[in-house]
Structures are given as C-alpha cells and as structure tokens.
Amino acid sequence: MSGTKWTDEQRQAIFTKDCNLLVAAGAGAGKTAVLVQRIIEKILDKGEPIDIDKLLVVTFTNAAAAEMRERIGDAISKGLDEDPESKVLRKQLTLLNKSNIMTIHSFCLQVIKNNFHTMEIDPNFRICDETEGILMKQEAIDELFDELYEIENEDFINLVESYASRKDTRLQEVVLELHRFAKSAPFSYDWLLNMAEEFNVGEEFNFEETPWADMIMEDMKVLLHGFKNMLQQSIDVILNSEGIDYYYEPFKMDLSFINSLLEKSSFKEFRGEIIAYDFPKLPLKRNKDADKEAKERVKKLRDKVKKKIVELKNILDSYENEFIKKEFIFLYPSMKALSNLVILFDKKYEAKKRERDLIDFNDIEHLCLSILTDKNSEGHIIPSDIALDYRKKFAEVLIDEYQDSNLVQEVIMSMVSRVKGYWSFYNGQLMFNEEEINLEEPQICLDIPNRFMVGDVKQSIYRFRQAKPEIFLDKYNEYSEEEGTKNRKVKLFKNFRSRKEVINGVNYLFKQIMSKTIGELDYTEEEALKVGASYGEEVKGEPIELCLMDKKYEISEEVLKEYNVDEEEALDNIQLEGRLVAKKIQKLVGNNLEGGLKVFDKKLGEYRNLQYRDIVILMRATSNWAPIFVEELAKEGIPVFADTNSGYFDTAEIKTMISLLQIIDNPLQDIPLLSVLRSPIASFTDDELIDIRMVNKNITFYECMEIIYRLYKNEKLDSYYSFYIEDENKINKIIKDMNEKLKNKICSFIEKLKLWREKSIHIDIDEFIWFLYVETGYYGYAGALQAGEQRQANLRILFQRAKQYAKTSYKGLFNFINFINKLKFSSGDMGSAKILGENENVVRIMSIHKSKGLEFPVVILSGTGKNFNMTDLNKNILFHRDLGYGPDYVDTERRIAYPSLVKNIIKNKIRLETLSEEMRILYVALTRAREKLIITGLINNMDKTVEDWLNLSEDKNKVPEYAVMSGKTYLDWIGPALIKHKDAVSFREELKMTSELSNIVDDKSKWKIELWNKRELLKEKVEEDEVEISEKIKETLMNLEESNYKEEIYKRLSFKYKYDNASSIPTKLSVSDVKKQFILDEKENTEELFKKLELRKPMFMEEKKKISPSERGTIIHLFMQHLDLKKAENEEDIKEQINRLIEREFITYEQSKVISPYKILKFCRGELGKRILNSNNVNKEMPFSIEIPALEIYKELDKEIYKDEKLIIQGVIDCYFEEEDGLVLLDYKTDYVNDIEEIKNRYEIQIKYYEEALNRITGKNVKDKYLYLFSVDNYIKID
C-alpha cells in the first residue's frame, strides 16, 4: 500500500520478524514512518494478518500515540478507497478504536482497571493532581516528623542532627527527594534497604575488591590516557628539536610508567605503583644551540602531568582500607535510619491516598508491576498469571523512544513480552537473567520472541526523569546485525531531514567529542549520520556558523562616552548575545541590501524566501535568557515568541486576582489588600489610601477601613477596635473631615468584601472565581487592555486550575491559596497561556528539550558558553540508582563534617553521567536544523581560551577524553574540535595565533567562525539610532527652511551663556568623578566629563535587567562591610554569613550568587585578612567630605578668576585599620584586571584623596595603601 521508497535498512526494520528487534534510528531517519509501516504490514499481511488490537504499541507521549493512530487510519482508509470490499481492511478500521496504541502509563492504567480486584484499591479510584499529591506529601511528612519527635526516636534524632542543619525542612527535602528517586526502582523498598546495607561491612571488608575501587581506577585511567598523549607529544617535540635530546630518557621513563598503570587490572597494584613512583629529575645541561621554545614547551607539559599525578597520589593515599571501613561502619546507622524513614513516610503517604481513594502518577507503574509479577520459590521475579495472559494476547510488543525507558518500565514490558528469563537482585542491583524458568503453566511461544524496540540512544535526554539509557545500550552492544538471530539490531542512520552541510558538521563534531566515557557511545563512522535528503543544486548549502564573543572584552569609558551607552547596557553579556542573534536573523531574513536566505518548502515543492517562522532559537534553559533575547529581537523589529515555563504568576492580572482571593480568605493582610485597592477592582488613589492609614498606624489597613465603616454607619465599635483607639474624638474628626465620596467608597468595598467572603463558603472555588470575574468586571477590563487576549487567557487558566482543584480531596478557599502557592514553588512557576498559532510568522525561542522530535529550516543554538548546571552535586546526601547513597560524614560530637569517600565516588559518577546527558542534549539541538545552523556563545578571555584549545589539538581525530571530561560548557567541547579544522585558519590568524598546527583536519564539513566584540555591537546599534535621528533632523530642517521664524530660531539656538565654564563646575564631586577627570586625555574638554544632566527613565520604569558589573561591585562591597573575619574559617562559615544578609534582607538570593565564598575565603586567609584580624581598630565604609581648591581639578580654568573657588570632594573608604606604626588603607575592586599598571594608574588619584581624608580626619599617618582585586584574588600596593 505504501508508495514510499524504503532503504534496505528501513525494509529490514519493517519486515524482519520472529526475533527481538532493536532499531537504532538516528536523528531524521524516519523512525515513526518505519514503525507505522511495520504495524500496517502486520495488520494487512496477506498471509497471516494480525488484528491491530493484538499489538501493543507503547509511545512516549499521548500526542505521538494519536499521530500514530491517525497515520494508520489514513493508510487503512486509502486501502479501502482502492478496495472498498476488503473485509480485512473494514475489520481493522473497526478495531482501530480498540487498539492498544498508548503511552506506558495508559497501558499500566488499563492493567490496573482490568485487575483492580487483585489489589487493595477501590475500583472508583482517581488519579490525584500533582499539586494535590504535593500537599498530601507535606501533610504526611509533617505528621511523621512530629510523631518521631514525640517518641524521641534515637535514630531519627541522630539523623536530624547530622543532616537537617537548623531546620527540619532540609531533611524533609532529602526524604522527599529520595522517595521520588526510589520510585524509579522496580521494587523501591528492596532498593532502599539494599542501599543502606552496602554500609554494613564486617571485619573482612576489603575496599580494593569493591566495585567502587574499580570505578576509581577506570576514571583515573581516562586521565592517564590524556597524560600519555601529552608525554608522547613531548617526546615527538624532543626528537624533532635542536639540542634537547638529553630530555628523551626521563620522558621515556615517565611514559613507561603511565603505560604500566594503564595495563593494571588490580586496584591494589594500581594504587601501589602510582604512590611509589618518583619522577626522575630533568638533566641540567646547557646547550646554547638548544631550541628554547621547544624546551620550555615540553617542560610545561611535563610539569602539568606531574602536578596531576601528585593530585591522584593524594587521592589514592587517602583510600586506606581501615579508614574506609571505619567510615562505612560509622555511616551505617544513619543510612539505615534514612531508608527506614523514607519507608515510613511512604506508608503514611499511601494511607492518606487510600483514605481518599487516590493513586498518584508513580503508583500507576508500581501497581501495574505488582499485578504482572510474582516471585518463585527461589525469590526470582517471574511473570504472574495475568502477565501470561497478556503474553498470549499480544502477538508483538512495539516500544517507541526506547532509549528513554526506566527500569520499572523495562520490567513491565518484559513481563508482557515473550522473553526467556527472570529478574533477580545481585549485589543490591536488579538484573535480568536470560535462562529458562519453571512455571506452573508453560510459557507461551517462548521460542518466538516478539519485542520491537526503536530509539536513538544519542537522543536520550531524560535522565532527570530517571530514564536509563543503559537499557538501550546493553542491547545495542549485545544484539547482532546478522539475519536469523533471535536478538537482532538494525541501524537506521540515513538522515532525511538535513542538508549535507549540517550532517557533515554534526558528524565531524561528535566524532571528535562523543565517547563511551562522555556520551556513553563511541561516535564512529558506523554511528555517523548519512545524507538522505535531497535539496537539489538550485540553492547551495551554507557552512555552519560559530559566532563567538569575548565576555572580558573591556570597553573603555571613552568608548561608552563616544557611543552614549551606559555601563549596564554595555556589559550585559546575555543582552549582547541576544543583539548578535538579532543581527544574524536580520541578515538571514533579508532586512538589508544583501538579500535573505532561500529555503526549500516541502509543501510547495520549491524554494522560497526565509520567513521568521522558519527560525528557532534553542537554549539549554529559557527562564533567564529568553526574556532578554525577546527584548533584543523586539528592539530590532523582529517578531518573537518565547516558550518558557515561567512568568505566569508575575502577570499583573494573575497577581491581582490572587491578591483578591487572599483578602477574601483573610482581609488582615496589608500587601494583597493594598494591591486590590489600587487595582481597577476598587480604584482607590494614593491620597485616599493615605487618608485611611491616618486613622491608626499600628493596626492593619483593613482594620482602619473597618473603623471608618462602623463609625460612618453609626455602628458601635466592639472592645477589639476600642482597644486601638486612644482618642475617639480625634478619630471622629478625621472621619468627619474625610471626603464623603471616599467614605462611600470604603463602605461599598467593605460590604462587597463581606458578601464575597460569605459567598466563598457556599460555592465551589471554580464557580466562585468566575463569579468574581463577572462581579468585579475584571475579566472584561483585562480584555480591553493591551494584549487583552493574552490576559484573558491567563485568567482562564486560573479558572481551569480552580476547576482542577475542585475535583481534589481538598476544599475551601484557604486550601486553594495553599494549592496555588505550592504550584508556584514546586513547579517553578509556569508559562503564560499560549495563544499563538503554529503558523504565526514569529521567531520562536524554546528549550532544547521542547525541540526534541521537531525540525526547523534554521536553528540558532545560543548560550553555549553558559556553565552546565552541577548544583545538585553540592547536596549533603547524593543518590545514585546503581551505587546507592553518597552522604557527607558528619560527626556531631566532634563537630566534624566532610564528604565521605563513597560520596566523592558517586559525585564523580553523577558528574560524568550529567556530562553524557549534556553531550546528548547538544546532539539533539544540532540535529533539529534542516538547512542552516548557527551556534553562538560567550567566552571568558578569548586569547587564553583559544590557546588552551590549541594545546588540545595533538590528536587530529579526537579531542582528548580528559579535556571533554573537564568541560564546563558546550564551547569547551566545540572549541577544541573546531580550532584544528581547516576552516579555522582565518580565525586563528585574526587572533594572531601564529603557531603552526601539525594536525590540521581536512574534513569535508564546512564551518565559518566569527569573532564578535562588544564595541562592534554597540557601534552598530548606535549607528542605526543615529541614522534614524538624522532623518528626523533633516525632516525638521526642511520644514524650517519654509518657516517665517527661521532667523529668530537660529539666533536662539546659537546663543552662548557668558559664564558657561563656571556653570559646568559642580559644587560637589565624588572621588570616582575626580578619578575619571584625571584619567581623561589632557586635551579633552572638561565639559565632556560633566555634561548637563541628561534625563533618563526613572528606575521603576526601567525594564528588569540582569545584575550589572557596577551592581555586582556594590553587592560585594556590602558583604565585605558586614564580613566577620573571626567567623570565616571555611566556605561554609562564609555561606552562613551570606545567608544571614539574605535573611535580614540586605541582599536578595539572586544578588547573593555574585558573592564567591571561595574568593572571600582567599581574602580572609591572605596577608591582608590576617592583618585585619590582628588589628584592634578596624573601620569599614567610612564616609567623608573634604574641601579642596577647584583649580586642583580644573587646571584649564583661568587662575585669577577661579583662585578662590572651592569644591567638596566626598567618598566612602572601604576599610582602614590601625597597626603600631600607622594606618593601613584598603580599597576593594571588582573590575576585570588585564594590566596591573593600568589598574594602579586608574585608581592612584582616588587613593590619594582617601589618604588625605584619613590624615585630616584622624590626624594619623597612613603608612600603607592597598587595592584588593577580587578578579585575581590578590592585592597591589599603591606607593
């Protein structure tokens, strides 16, 4: 029936039968089409057709299931058009509605509903809403903690003291996270208990024989391979350079040592050899003909190897068996208590769900698992009778997106598939054993395997949902490509989506960086994508573009002045990357003289001009970056939409409605009440609110309104209100003098509020919210505003949430507000309502995860210089599904806390798995592009970074694994791969990287690497603004030529004030202003520095921006002002001090992120920190004002006229302290430092005035003056 021309590999995937078939389908390989065609061939087979309801087809999403059902229905309908009398086709069309094409959760739910009698659940059970589940979990854990405190459970108390810090919430979070994590294991109680028992070691314990030891050794061997390459590279240089051959022997010995370590299989031998090795000293021969550059280069490489080996020695030296044994024994009670605590919590949570006849999302899989599994007499997990019935029913089980399966899903699918074997626990891990098992009823058709699995492990990007790509990989490595085998694999790597330029670039990059270590698969020629799409010769493909910008490209104040740009705008790197992307889009779409890109339209079958809708900007995460990009693109007139999961609760209409609900529940809340009173719902003015507050400043705002209401209505005040009225006559006078209109307004609002409070009790919350929309007119008002359709859509979402809540077991307005608050914080906010159609002509911004399965003519991947998110590694207890618990070692009696050995191992394992996930996410991003791919990113210190990339280019075929392992951004991977590509030559030349590369790669992929800088982007922006302004000026001047007042206008515009020089001199100057004046070119006119006041938008009207460098400096200065050096012994102490400032609301949490505990600790432990500690007289943030002659600053002024003019210089001294022989002045600087001498010159005059101020104020000598530079963690002395 299909007219599609299938490739040989696709035909194998469609027609191969009687085996377990794994189809590895690369990006754009048409796997959905293949899966659908396989189903169609099965149900329409002329020899042995299979009814469609005898197939189980498991998809990843409901949308995928619906699409698959639709495709199959279309194919059957098309067949009926050709053969209307076909009984087979008619039957299959009828059965299609009964087909088992569904998600794994839908299948599990079907199993539960058909077999609820085997479980202790009500047949009328309901699946609880996610937020309802969160509320129940919080109730359960609060009750559990209260109970355990009450009975003074010793294990629980010890656990709290060790891991709860100051609040129980931290331990509660650990329990909730571990509970969620354990639910990804098929038998979660077994997993929890087994993981705790790993710490229960006896006297016979030998760490060297554990899997942990092997893991340490294997991870270190990856680094050793890198060291081997470095040493081999050094030997090559020695042999090919003049006069340094005497280095050959020691380098050869080092290389032999590394090779010996790589061959070791015993951890004991590996550890012993690395600890015992001493690097031989290099000969001190002098040879005047020696190649000094080569000599220095190999010495640097060897020093780097030596340093790393010493680090490994220190790590291995700490892995002493007795020490580790004691650590395990000490941690065992806590870990056992933790497992038991999670089990107790789960039982309490289960009881709460049973009371309400509820199950949650996790229960669906676990209940299904318990229905489908039994244990035999040997404790092996085997299929139940119900599972055997499913094996009889399903002729084939087809699983889509198999790479995203978790272990629970894998066990479920194995129970209903015809596979030989059983599951059992081995060393705490659930393993599948492919062996015969004895069943009371013989297994059905076990000789005919019936599993079809399709996916791409390179696109497995859901590890955070506990997806386990190893399930796919194990089969991929074990299954054979030979015909006739019972476990077979087929590879579909021909890409029918992208141009060859995109495919060649993707292949080049991932051959360089993806490996079993990072990515969990070697990306070889065999795994590489093959070109399958044809774009003809009419339009040539373009190279992949890499656009880089240096974060540290310093813009001088002169440049800022020249382009009239303030510091914040100039230095917001995300904003500038957004501006760069906007420029690229303008060029692509053709908003300039060069014309735009042509793309092929599949529907039209021809090329057309690129439209905005053809472009997507992909980001790793959109929450912080997308709004800034939207702003920049909008400035350039580019229509744009950002698909984010945030911002909904910040919209004005939702904040107003939630405030209204809050005061209906409890009006004694000033902030939400004032929000409603100022809104169109009540329309009070600021002056009216002030009049109300004058009644009494010591009670709530509502109580003030209530007093006015009662006295105005001549109602008697009860004792509660009378208590707050000190002078009733005074209050009566205030009310008497009050505007009559205001009093009526207050009465009207109070009466409405009382009515609403009463009504909220008697109707469901969703009805009540809609009643408020209509009663207040707010829904109609929101619709009349700008973006009214969007605002009303947001209000409808709140109504839908209320409707959803009304179906839960929780009732009432108070609980609904809690429900919304939990939704806000547990789900991390959510995006605004989507009112945008698919065909809207806008550029879309979305996360890489949301783009999976989609394709776009043009893809721009941005934010590639952003660090990977590794914050989870800092938690005090880590969890790993295979390795178990990784806790901190906490001894409360001795007040000792440090990461345990097993935590360090697990931390490294999770880090590598996270990097592998990031590698696959990068692959997904790059393979979304059909015709054009652009990558943008910011780099810290371009010259140094590129130099580092060049040092990693010794192997032309692969970026060293150790370098990939140490990567912190996508650019850390992309850069070293591309720097040795033949297309990077001009880029290297632009950076004046003249050193020759011996390993330039002549690959067929095409790249264009561009270096952008901030000055360039600022200049372009200003030039565009200037063109627009000049056009307006021209238009005005043309009109002026025809004006009767032309001469008078020119005369007035040409007027010059006689004492203009004097008017430009301020009466006060800050020290920073003085500094600026002194660093200006001597010829520069003073007026340029102190221009007349320019009007800007007030801050409250400015759009929210990221923390600027100047704000960063202010935050760090504020912290240093409050820093207690006596309580700063480690980073934890400093974090505590940061948290204290947050709690006292000196800084926000977002602002606290710019303070580096590591850098602060370096200051505290440094010379200046120690001197401050030893001083008995330390002063911080001391303001001063001193008077000086104006001519001291303004030397160009007439000396006779201005000899008596004075200026006030004012400033704030960061810190000064007293020692025996004088004062020490200290000033903190957060500037980026490029040149020490330049920094000294820049701040010399500033420090001079600080010194003069201290001399005048204290009468004491300033003996030392220092600048402390946080960017380099060091100080410089000012002479």
UniProtKB/Swiss-Prot annotation:
It holds the Pfam family PDDEXK_1. InterPro entries: AddA (IPR014152), DNA_helicase_UvrD-like_C (IPR014017), DNA_helicase_UvrD/REP (IPR000212), P-loop_NTPase (IPR027417), PDDEXK-like_dom_sf (IPR011604), PDDEXK_AddAB-type (IPR038726), Restrct_endonuc-II-like (IPR011335), UvrD-like_ATP-bd (IPR014016). Heterodimer of AddA and AddB/RexB. Gene3D superfamilies: 3.90.320.10, P-loop containing nucleotide triphosphate hydrolases. Its EC number is 3.1.-.-, 5.6.2.4. The gene is addA. Residues 526-853 form the UvrD-like helicase C-terminal domain. Its cofactor is Mg(2+). Belongs to the helicase family. AddA subfamily. This is ATP-dependent helicase/nuclease subunit A. Keywords: ATP-binding, DNA damage, DNA repair, DNA-binding, Exonuclease, Helicase, Hydrolase, Isomerase, Nuclease, Nucleotide-binding. ATP binds at residues 25-32. One of its GO terms (molecular function) is ATP hydrolysis activity. Residues 4-499 form the UvrD-like helicase ATP-binding domain. GO terms for biological process: double-strand break repair via homologous recombination. It catalyses: Couples ATP hydrolysis with the unwinding of duplex DNA by translocating in the 3'-5' direction; ATP + H2O = ADP + phosphate + H(+). The heterodimer acts as both an ATP-dependent DNA helicase and an ATP-dependent, dual-direction single-stranded exonuclease. Recognizes the chi site generating a DNA molecule suitable for the initiation of homologous recombination. The AddA nuclease domain is required for chi fragment generation; this subunit has the helicase and 3' -> 5' nuclease activities. The lineage of its organism: Bacteria, Bacillati, Bacillota, Clostridia, Eubacteriales. One of its GO terms (cellular component) is cytosol. It comes from the Bacteria.
